[in-house]
Amino acid sequence: MSAIRVGIVGYGNLGRGVEFAISQNPDMELVAVFTRRDPSTVSVASNASVYLVDDAEKFQDDIDVMILCGGSATDLPEQGPHFAQWFNTIDSFDTHAKIPEFFDAVDAAAQKSGKVSVISVGWDPGLFSLNRVLGEAVLPVGTTYTFWGDGLSQGHSDAVRRIEGVKNAVQYTLPIKDAVERVRNGENPELTTREKHARECWVVLEEGADAPKVEQEIVTMPNYFDEYNTTVNFISEDEFNANHTGMPHGGFVIRSGESGANDKQILEFSLKLESNPNFTSSVLVAYARAAHRLSQAGEKGAKTVFDIPFGLLSPKSAAQLRKELL
């Protein structure tokens, strides 16, 4: 069987992770990387060629699945429907509140072109979403809890870096251990935002910056920190470079419910990741395989992780899966 031919749009942390993940899957090959930058300035780790993103349309006969590696704020809302005109696509759109409208926009383009587009792939949305559905279906009487961390939040880190006087910064989301244990114990607590997570900032200041002023701006920032207990730590650039340049993340989905007359049941799924973008990339590549198979079977339109059987993610045949993993 010929390899699944993959293209990548965008060559940042996620795009580089997808490139590496493809190399770990023998049934796939990377055909091309598409970038908004001058292709001659982009050095890739594989043998794939690099092209301007505007030239992608010319490759519709050479690529089975295009993996879109842009950001959710401005890139994917435009790129999702755009590339669905010509390719089966995978993306990691993660603005939860806007997923329904994004789905509709991509679906309209994919239905028209006859392509398959799997949106909002990754771990949240993605694998966590699947486990929320599983928990509700199996334990209809109960409560679902999602905890994130310990992990670096890129959006919140960017928000801190935009503050005047900040040279560099990262922000970690931390699940509050007492809250997690109460859920695991089957107490079904009603938890506020502040009771579920804390935020921790590590900040390098510009020379002469006003530390108390910066700290106050951080802890009172609406939509980011004002609803959380936030700790701000000021450190040197050397300490920052030594200890805070990784991109770890993770979390838990816990369904606490009842079955039978009064049996307490806990269903839990957890992740502990050294690299958020590299793990997300691996999920994207697995769903690229599924998108290709769905397309070959005559499917079209937008899909989410809820629409795709797990068996389609695996390179193994249905018979192998029944024998080895069932």
Swiss-Prot record:
It catalyses: meso-2,6-diaminopimelate + NADP(+) + H2O = (S)-2-amino-6-oxoheptanedioate + NH4(+) + NADPH + H(+). It comes from the Bacteria. Its EC number is 1.4.1.16. Pathway: Amino-acid biosynthesis; L-lysine biosynthesis via DAP pathway; DL-2,6-diaminopimelate from (S)-tetrahydrodipicolinate: step 1/1. Coiled coil: none annotated. One of its GO terms (molecular function) is diaminopimelate dehydrogenase activity. Substrate binds at D94, D124, W148, Q154, G155, T173, R199, H249, N276. Induction: Constitutively expressed. Not induced by meso-2,6-diaminopimelate. The keyword Oxidoreductase applies. The keyword Amino-acid biosynthesis applies. Pfam families: DAPDH_C. NADP(+) binds at residues 11-14, 35-37, 69-72, 92-94, 121-125. L-2-amino-6-methylene-pimelate is also a potent competitive inhibitor (5 uM) of this reaction. Glyoxylate inhibits the reductive amination of L-2-amino-6-oxopimelate about 30%. The enzyme is inhibited completely by p-chloromercuribenzoate and HgCl(2) in vitro. Keywords: Amino-acid biosynthesis, Diaminopimelate biosynthesis, Lysine biosynthesis, NADP, Oxidoreductase. Optimum pH is about 10.5 for the oxidative deamination of meso-diaminopimelate and 7.5 for the reductive amination of L-2-amino-6-oxopimelate. The rate of the amination reaction declines markedly above pH 9.0. It is an enzyme of class 1 (oxidoreductase). GO terms for biological process: diaminopimelate biosynthetic process; lysine biosynthetic process via diaminopimelate. Probably plays a role in lysine biosynthesis. Homodimer. Belongs to the diaminopimelate dehydrogenase family. The reductive amination proceeds through a sequential ordered ternary-binary mechanism. NADPH binds first to the enzyme followed by L-2-amino-6-ketopimelate and ammonia, and the products are released in the order of meso-2,6-diaminopimelate and NADP(+). This is Meso-diaminopimelate D-dehydrogenase.
